């Protein structure tokens, strides 16, 4: 987008150090052109690869490369390692549903035992858990460390029968679940000089074995200055599993025992522990680099100089001082920024600062805005910028004397000096063409093709808009909204409506030339709702009848967006299009699409094509929309393939939202759709936005993920940004960081309010820096890490084979944990898996990401659904991605009707269900109520008002309003869960042992997937094996 006339010189014109001075980076997966595997990163027959099924690798030199990803991220080609045994062949859905075995136990029998074997897992013994706190190391574990930890140990197991010697030939394992069902096996492994078996990656360069006395290879250089104190971590031990394990000298074989899932780290326990220690308290942001409560913990946040974690969460709150440390640890340095996050009513709203025509005070060199990180000197006449260290003169209007500690006397009176987040009123320098913007407009665009008329959708939309238009957002002090509204209907042609307030009847104008769309009227198209209410209601009453006899099935789509954008452009205002659409646009027009849903591409290198838009029309249309501040929100009602990858591109790139209701049925889906529409119309939103992330010297923002457009390396452009959208930003070093000054981040968003005022919203955050790797690991936040990994992987889906992306994710998980083990943990047996306390649930969350249908196809999931989920995750904040990948599972049968507390959640595994139980599962998109066959009759009566399990109607999507405590309590709990989520969750009732349970079971993410995807236990074993291989 051309910036001319968009933002004048003061705000964003001058470069700052470290911004825009290098070519763009491509995150952790690289752009399509970078596909060579960096040395030491990919191990085609690594620990999860085609090694001997029961064999062991001889100790040898370490992997050759220093780290897994180069400066521009990891790039890999060829076959990634095979990982887990694949599922049995699937003939049809019904037969793959394991029958329930009659059981005397109350526990819920699963189709796959939790001790289901892999080549490693089959030899695991039972684990016992031994916890030791920060002051106690386990016996023979070396010095105590500062971190609390959990140690999981296993008794010895039988020695492995064979050791892989040079030249040994072993058969590859069966096709793996990580590479998708049916993946072809890899070639036979062969001996390599670095001690790893398997074929070398293309272009790999080998290093000779180390000379006598030489240390481990560059992959894990020994730490001296930055080794830090020893830290205890969660430890799982698998004696004898790996080279160096004590079981090589073990006695007679011991009987195999089941691996106990209770002995591995539990996400539920981590969530509950944090709630117990920090829930309901005040969290003050006055300390640099402090780790906030988890997103799952409710607390009151008090801004005392750093932005609330509602606005910014980081993957780690302590950055490594050098890029070498960052490469060694492999922990992504990133922030998830949600600039318009909703602030609870018990917390202070953002203060608005108005400096009149002078505008915000900014650093002359780097253009950072005045904030708590600026240091005033020389009696208050000058200040030193915290970001670039430039010394600036204080403008005369802004001068104030300093107190005895060098702080301004008005420190606590000025939000920009004492708070982490605040807003400025922007001057004309920050406006397009240096003139104030007009208030935004909402345009409602309704597909009136045959199917939408016949199923009653058009009538429903028109009816509901009458009441919803009353709720169009307005400024708190205003009586009416400044937002204007307009209406268009379409099928193969476009119908514009004149609803000027002085008309007796609305007037329709038809545009048939969809190749060159124009706006046939200006005056009367965009109107104030209050003034034209009667004409608008008249129109909404007429539309369903107007098209009642239409037999037109073909629709256009791109011209609809074009028409809305041209209307906003003609009115010289930003705005939002609400498009209600239901079919593949097959009519002759720009953006015409064909059905390209090809299942043959699944599990091939061409699978990425399914996620790419079919034509470049939508990409250029999105750029035009952003250039004119036009955001697009799309409500899709498909009954078959509609190519979400193409249709959803404009909503994604313009800061809009995509909602999808498959096979829409009025009686089942009406409420979900209306809830979504109402929330979308009413939500807090900013228009025509540009975001810039500034950093202190030593590091810079290099990559951005979200519903955004970038025409250069620094400015994040968004036609609109609302309270649910987050942008994830990755940082890289460009120099050393100082422990004293830390790492400072300032996010500035320039936007237009719903009343047409131009503002700047500023968020500031200070992080610590350390030369000790231990500090970096102590300060990590797993929920933010998973948000980053998901977005970087889902972005890479457009350019790289999915199996390569899955491989990179497993590789990086192992690298992070191996670096911790080598440099931070107390000495321990090689057979123990040691996890940092802050990352002990990283493996389970990473496995959930790997099993998501975007990265691992499943036969029952459509191509459109995969494209839809990919798009949703790209704009999610940390709380939404946490719930999406690890759903909440609540035992409803344990409800205490006298308490307002939610029942304690249980782990997402079939083993946690019981025949006597009723469970509620929610992941932010779906909600299920699962009913065991022996559910208590009094609960069934209380919730459904029917006498028994057999009488329950599973078609209902809303619970009946039964006037008893159980029903009221359950509906209250569902309301609480729903209230915090951006999408309305339709309820599905699932009975144990009935067919719909197949869908429900896919959300039990700790279990093995029906069509691929490892169980949590198996994944943990495989990560451990890979860590051991890295360390050896």
From Swiss-Prot:
Disease per record is:
Cole-Carpenter syndrome 2: A form of Cole-Carpenter syndrome, a disorder characterized by features of osteogenesis imperfecta such as bone deformities and severe bone fragility with frequent fractures, in association with craniosynostosis, ocular proptosis, hydrocephalus, growth failure and distinctive facial features. Craniofacial findings include marked frontal bossing, midface hypoplasia, and micrognathia. Despite the craniosynostosis and hydrocephalus, intellectual development is normal. CLCRP2 inheritance is autosomal recessive.
Q: Which organism is it from?
A: Homo sapiens
Q: Where in the cell is it found?
A: Cytoplasmic vesicle, COPII-coated vesicle membrane; Endoplasmic reticulum membrane; Cytoplasm, Cytosol
Listed GO CC annotations: COPII vesicle coat; cytosol; endoplasmic reticulum exit site; endoplasmic reticulum membrane; ER to Golgi transport vesicle membrane; intracellular membrane-bounded organelle
**Tissue specificity statement from the Swiss-Prot or TrEMBL entry:** Ubiquitously expressed, with higher amounts in placenta, pancreas, heart and liver.
Comp. bias (Polar residues)? 102-133
- What protein am I looking at? Protein transport protein Sec24D
Annotated region described as Disordered, given as residue ranges: 1-260
Q: Which family does it belong to?
A: Belongs to the SEC23/SEC24 family. SEC24 subfamily.
The segments labelled Zinc finger-like in the record are: 363-388
Q: Does the keyword Ion transport apply?
A: no
């Amino acid at each position: 987008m051309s910036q001319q006339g968009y933002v004048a010189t003061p705000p964003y014109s001058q470069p700052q150090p470290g911004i825009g001075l290098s070519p763009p980076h491509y995150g952790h997966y690289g752009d399509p052109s970078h596909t060579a595997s960096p040395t030491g990163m990919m191990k085609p027959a690594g620990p999860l690869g085609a090694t001997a099924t029961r064999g062991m690798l001889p100790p040898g030199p370490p992997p050759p490369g220093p780290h897994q990803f180069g400066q521009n991220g990891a790039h890999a080609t060829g076959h990634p390692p095979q990982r887990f045994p694949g599922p049995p062949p699937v003939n049809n859905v019904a037969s793959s549903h394991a029958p329930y075995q009659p059981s005397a136990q109350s526990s819920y029998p699963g189709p796959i035992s939790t001790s289901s074997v892999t080549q490693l897992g089959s030899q695991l013994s039972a684990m016992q858990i031994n916890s030791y706190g920060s002051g106690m190391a386990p016996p023979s574990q070396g010095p105590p460390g500062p971190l609390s930890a959990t140690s999981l140990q296993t008794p010895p197991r039988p020695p492995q029968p064979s050791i892989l010697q040079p030249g040994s030939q072993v058969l590859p394992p069966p096709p793996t679940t990580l590479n998708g069902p049916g993946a072809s096996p890899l070639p036979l492994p062969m001996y390599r000089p670095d001690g790893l078996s398997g074929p070398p990656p293309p272009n790999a360069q080998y290093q000779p074995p180390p000379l006598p006395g030489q240390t481990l290879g560059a992959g894990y250089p020994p730490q001296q200055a930055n080794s830090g104190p020893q830290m205890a971590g969660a430890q799982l031990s698998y004696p004898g599993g790996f080279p160096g394990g004590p079981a090589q000298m073990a006695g007679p074989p011991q009987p195999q025992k089941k691996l106990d899932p209770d002995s591995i780290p539990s996400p539920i326990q981590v969530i509950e522990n944090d709630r117990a220690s920090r829930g309901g308290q005040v969290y003050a942001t006055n300390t640099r680099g402090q780790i906030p409560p988890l997103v799952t913990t409710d607390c009151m946040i008090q801004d005392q100089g750093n932005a609330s974690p509602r606005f910014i969460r980081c993957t780690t709150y302590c950055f490594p001082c050098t890029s070498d440390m960052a490469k060694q640890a492999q922990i992504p340095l990133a922030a998830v920024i949600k600039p318009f996050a909703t602030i609870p009513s018990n917390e202070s709203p953002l203060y608005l600062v108005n400096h009149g025509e002078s505008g915000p005070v900014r650093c002359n060199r780097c253009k950072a805005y005045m904030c708590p990180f600026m240091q005033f000197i020389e009696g208050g006449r000058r200040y030193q910028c915290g970001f670039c260290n430039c010394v600036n003169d204080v403008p005369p209007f802004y001068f104030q004397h300093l107190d005895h500690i060098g702080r301004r006397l008005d420190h606590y009176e000025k939000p920009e000096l004492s708070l982490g987040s605040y807003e400025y009123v922007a001057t004309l320098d920050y406006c397009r063409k240096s003139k104030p913007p007009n208030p935004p407009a909402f345009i409602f665009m309704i597909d009136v093709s045959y199917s939408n008329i016949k199923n009653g959708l058009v009538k429903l939309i028109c009816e509901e808009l009458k009441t919803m238009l009353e709720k169009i957002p307005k400024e708190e002090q205003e009586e009416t909204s400044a937002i204007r509204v307009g209406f268009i209907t379409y099928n193969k042609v476009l119908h514009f409506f004149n609803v000027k307030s002085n008309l007796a009847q609305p007037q329709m104008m038809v545009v048939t030339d969809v190749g060159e769309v124009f706006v046939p009227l200006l005056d009367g198209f965009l109107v104030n709702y209050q003034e034209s209410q009667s004409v608008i209601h008249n129109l909404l009453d007429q539309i369903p009848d107007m098209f009642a006899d239409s037999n037109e099935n073909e629709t256009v789509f791109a011209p609809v967006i074009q028409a809305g954008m041209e209307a906003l452009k003609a009115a010289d205002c930003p705005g939002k299009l609400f498009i209600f659409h239901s079919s593949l646009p097959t009519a002759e027009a720009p953006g015409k699409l064909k059905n390209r849903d090809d299942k043959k591409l699944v599990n091939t290198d061409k699978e990425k094509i399914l996620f790419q838009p079919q034509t470049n029309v939508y990409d250029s249309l999105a750029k035009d929309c952003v250039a004119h501040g036009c955001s697009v929100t799309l409500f899709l009602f498909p009954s078959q393939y509609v190519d979400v990858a193409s249709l959803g591109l404009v909503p994604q790139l313009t800061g809009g939202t995509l909602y999808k209701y498959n096979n829409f049925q009025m009686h089942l889906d009406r409420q979900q759709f209306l809830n979504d529409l109402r929330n979308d119309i009413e939500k807090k939103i900013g228009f025509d936005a540009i975001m810039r992330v500034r950093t202190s010297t030593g590091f810079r923002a290099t990559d951005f993920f979200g519903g955004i457009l970038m025409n250069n390396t620094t400015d994040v452009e968004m036609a609109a940004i609302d309270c649910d959208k987050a942008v994830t930003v990755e940082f890289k070093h460009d120099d050393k960081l100082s422990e004293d000054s830390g790492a400072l981040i300032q996010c500035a968003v320039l936007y237009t309010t719903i009343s047409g005022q131009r503002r700047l919203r500023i968020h500031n955050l200070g992080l610590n820096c350390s030369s000790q790797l231990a500090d970096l690991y102590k300060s990590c936040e797993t929920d933010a890490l998973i948000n980053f990994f998901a977005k970087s992987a889902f972005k890479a889906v457009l350019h790289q084979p999915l199996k390569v992306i899955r491989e990179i994710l497993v590789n990086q998980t192992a690298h992070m944990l191996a670096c911790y083990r080598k440099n931070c943990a107390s000495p321990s047996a090689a057979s123990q898996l040691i996890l940092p306390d802050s990352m002990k649930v990283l493996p389970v969350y990473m496995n959930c990401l790997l099993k998501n249908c975007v990265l691992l196809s499943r036969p029952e999931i459509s191509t459109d659904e995969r494209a839809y989920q990919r798009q949703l995750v790209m704009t999610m904040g940390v709380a939404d991605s946490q719930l999406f990948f690890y759903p909440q599972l609540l035992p409803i049968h344990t409800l205490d009707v006298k308490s307002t507390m939610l029942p304690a959640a249980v782990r997402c595994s079939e083993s946690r269900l019981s025949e006597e139980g009723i469970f509620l599962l929610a992941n932010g998109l779906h909600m299920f109520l699962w009913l065991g066959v022996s559910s208590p009759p009094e609960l069934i009566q209380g919730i459904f008002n029917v006498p028994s399990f057999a009488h329950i109607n599973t078609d209902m999507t809303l619970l009946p309003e039964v006037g008893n405590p159980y029903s009221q309590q359950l509906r209250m709990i569902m309301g609480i869960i729903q209230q915090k989520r951006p999408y309305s969750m339709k309820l599905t009732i699932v009975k144990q042992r009935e067919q719909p349970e197949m869908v429900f079971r896919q959300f039990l993410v700790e279990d093995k997937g029906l069509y691929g995807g490892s169980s949590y236990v198996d994944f943990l074993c495989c990560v451990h094996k890979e860590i051991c291989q890295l360390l050896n």
